[in-house]
Design a protein with these regions (language model features):
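Mid/C-terminal beta-alpha module of Rossmann-like enzyme folds, strongest
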Residues: 2, 244-294, 328-334
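N-terminal Rossmann NAD(P)H-binding glycine-rich loop of SDR-like oxidoreductase domains
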Residues: 3-23
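NAD(P)H-binding glycine-rich loop region in Rossmannoid oxidoreductase-like domains
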Residues: 63, 67-127
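Conserved Rossmann-fold NAD(P)-dependent oxidoreductase catalytic core, especially the SDR/UDP-sugar
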Residues: 114, 126-168
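Conserved beta-loop-beta element that borders a ligand/cofactor-binding pocket
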Residues: 146, 179-202
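Glycine-rich "substrate-gating" loop/helix at the edge of Rossmann-like oxidoreductase active sites
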Residues: 165-170, 197-204, 224-234
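Alpha-helical substrate-binding/gating segment
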Residues: 211-219, 227-262
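C-terminal amphipathic/interface module of NAD(P)-dependent oxidoreductases
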Residues: 298-334
Length: 334
């Protein structure tokens, strides 16, 4: 199988590339022109990132990786998104996995930052679909990332793939993002939208940030601690992508979350046990709001009790279905 990936140097993209290569598949890394396709000191941006995180770069098995330059600003212009040689690498590919997007929690949400979050998701996805339309023998499947932020702050409501969207910034962002991906259906492509929960990984994503106060013995719940957290391990997230790539009967929305969401207070207690630290120092909601503003409301205090209904219907078997075993597994990763 030949799979084209955007966002290949991110947390999920790196792990997915590694997984596909181990099984002998070909990965085409779609790199925006001038955004890291060149090597520095013999390493790509993804390889440098992994070294900084204490990880080795993905090792090739029988598979291989090809890097292709892409100009994501040609949708309404006469220019070509790919050079002639790069275009050949994408023609005939089986699928595209769209994981591009600036970090949601990387910086506070100024208006400029919000614009970047939108452009790195909705705009890039629009340009991707437009570029695919220009191919003569393009991929037949688009697997595009989204997030459970789609649902907004919903208290104790049980959220399935059929639940209507919320109306805060993250919900609107996810709706815009997904709307651009759905346009690929007009090209005859099978489109799968993956709404990821909090991805647990030792060397990236939210977990290392969550662990910081615990390392200093001051960890605890956030706000009331009653808000629901829907999570998934990186291992399961990658396996879900692999399965929807291979199962051509799957299309539409899939919630990529474990079957047992937990309240924030319970998550804090489980994390404290996993790292052998107390979890008795709550972070008051007012302090979080003063420090982080809207981002605190949407990322730390919002409640999203999401269920993986589609995955359960498909018979997916989670490697780590409960939080305690998931944290134990994740924190012992090399």
């Amino acid at each position: 199988m030949k799979v084209v990936i955007t966002g290949s140097s991110g947390l999920v993209g790196t792990a997915l590339t590694d997984s596909l290569m181990r099984d002998g598949h070909t990965v085409v890394r779609l790199l925006r022109s001038g955004s890291g396709s060149k090597k520095e000191n013999g390493k790509t941006s993804g390889e440098r990132r992994e070294k900084e995180n204490g990880r080795s770069a993905p090792q090739s098995g029988a598979g291989k990786v090809i890097s292709v330059a892409w100009n994501p600003n040609t949708c309404n212009l006469e220019g070509e998104p790919f050079g002639s040689e790069d275009r050949k690498q994408i023609e005939g590919a089986d699928a595209v996995v769209n994981l591009a997007g600036a970090s949601i929690a990387g910086e506070s949400w100024s208006e400029e930052r919000k614009a970047l979050l939108r452009s790195s998701r909705a705009h890039i996805t629009r340009e991707l679909v437009c570029a695919l339309e220009k191919l003569e023998d393009g991929p037949k499947t688009l697997v595009s990332a989204s997030a459970i932020g789609y649902y907004g702050n919903r208290g104790d409501e049980v959220l399935t793939e059929e639940t209507k969207p919320g109306d805060d910034f993250l919900a609107r962002l996810a709706q815009e993002w997904e709307a651009e991906a759905v346009k690929a259906e007009a090209l005859g492509m099978r489109v799968v939208r993956l709404r990821f929960g909090i991805i647990l990984a030792k060397h990236g994503g939210a977990l290392p940030q969550m662990m910081r106060p615990f390392k200093f013995g001051v960890g605890g719940r956030m706000g009331s601690g009653r808000q629901w957290m829907s999570w998934i391990t990186l291992q399961d997230a990658v396996e879900v992508i692999r399965q929807v790539l291979e199962n051509r009967a799957v299309s539409g929305v899939v919630n990529v979350v474990a079957p047992h969401p937990v309240r924030n207070a319970d998550f804090a207690q489980a994390l404290g046990r996993a790292v052998h630290r107390p979890a008795v120092f709550p972070a008051p909601a007012i302090v979080l709001k003063l420090a982080l503003g809207e981002m605190a409301e949407a990322l730390l205090l919002a409640s999203q009790r999401v269920t993986p209904s589609r995955l359960e219907q498909l018979g997916y078997r989670f490697s780590q279905p409960d939080l305690s075993s998931a944290l134990a597994s994740v924190l012992t990763e090399r």
